[in-house]
């Protein structure tokens, strides 16, 4: 109950491993660290646990009437859309937080390596969710 405003930018990148995101994955705990932490659960379930735990802590340290700003994104896992922004809204509301508004940051899509036909929509935006703590 200390801060009037808390910002929370959790990991929402489902893919970990080799590549240019290695350092980011390591810092966010979504590389080998997430693999070790998840045990028998899927990578997505373990990542969702991190998001839920982080939002819970952000709300705990925010004083009543204060705001939690939470950034979320969408991704593709196994050809299926993963809606981390929806998970965060549900989690916050289940905790008693009020969603004041959501803001979308649209970005210009980057060219992607050709891996065959596009099977899923490109979600080239991030969501900022503004919660109020009761």
Regions found by a protein language model. Give the residues of each.
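Class I S-adenosyl-L-methionine-dependent methyltransferase catalytic core
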Residues: 1-134
């Amino acid at each position: 109950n200390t801060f009037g405003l808390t910002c929370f930018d959790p990991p929402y990148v489902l893919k970990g491993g080799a590549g240019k995101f290695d350092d980011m994955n390591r810092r966010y705990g979504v590389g080998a660290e997430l693999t070790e932490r998840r045990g028998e659960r899927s990578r997505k379930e373990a990542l969702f646990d991190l998001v839920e735990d982080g939002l819970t802590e952000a709300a705990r340290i925010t004083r009543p009437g204060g705001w939690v700003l939470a950034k979320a994104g969408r991704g593709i896992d196994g050809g299926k859309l993963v809606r981390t922004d929806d998970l965060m809204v549900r989690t916050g509301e289940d905790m008693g937080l009020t969603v004041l508004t959501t803001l979308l940051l649209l970005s210009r899509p980057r060219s992607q390596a050709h891996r065959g036909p596009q099977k899923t929509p490109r979600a080239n935006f991030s969501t900022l969710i503004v919660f109020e703590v009761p």
